[in-house]
């Protein structure tokens, strides 16, 4: 069964975009298609000048090195320290015969990892084992690991899921601030309307196989967004699907 039938979307560099919609409308699937963890069977996905569907081998690896992903589950190695988990992020930068990651000395890699931990407020937890951290702290380490990758685009699939309200809000504030300060594009999936409005420039709602809502966040009100989830999304016109990161 096709989840997304019709989608035509362009995301400018540096924009923060919230993807919303009911379960099963394709939000997470869309993020997975962008990094080729799921395959689109029609249309094109263009990111930073690359047509994603045509990439193979080393070219696909180089592309993925430019896109940071934060999942619902942080996937930290529990027996390793927070610092060691962040250092693993440098592996995503090894995309060719000689990369800047390979040119760094171990001490330089460690120093950069510490800077990433400091950026998420966890420099003092660097030597703690990952399995001793709270859920919110673990997600912060995952964000630091993603920063170690030096991405140009960040995809976040419900990074606030399974966290208490305060921790979830802090994680979203952190993601928004870090990506905004670095001029990165942020696309995040959220089921929290307050987060979608507060941490995005633009809100896109999926429904009925396509885009049912596409509006600047400042122009969306709570009643409209609540109704978007409570009522069936209106149908959208057919067309050749395309997704472009400009």
Regions found by a protein language model. Give the residues of each.
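Conserved ABC ATPase "signature" region
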Residues: 51, 94-124
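Conserved ABC ATPase signature
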Residues: 129-133, 137
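Conserved ABC transporter NBD signature motif
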Residues: 43-51
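Helix-to-loop junction immediately C-terminal to a conserved catalytic motif
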Residues: 35
